[in-house]
């Protein structure tokens, strides 16, 4: 039955290392995804006056912060709670890995709510753009 299985690829998580700094595939995926989303939102909102380009730029920053903070806090609370409650400063050690999708999603939702209230833009319009 082994011949029917697909072997799991053994991919090095680091793309390149410079001394103590290493560039990881996971981080590159985050950056590329945010940049593609930013470009997409600029394209679909080009023919509308509901949201300005400056507000879109601000929204992308809010979303990126929501992804990082929410993903890291979600990982800390859902997967390593006892370790992070004993040493809360470990939550800040993002270079050691640990992000959760559902934490990032909650972070984005919270950041969109805050952004829409601050800029007085309908949250349904923003949610529709990001969907």
Walk through the language-model features, giving the residues of each.
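Hydrophobic, membrane-interfacing alpha helices
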Residues: 1-131
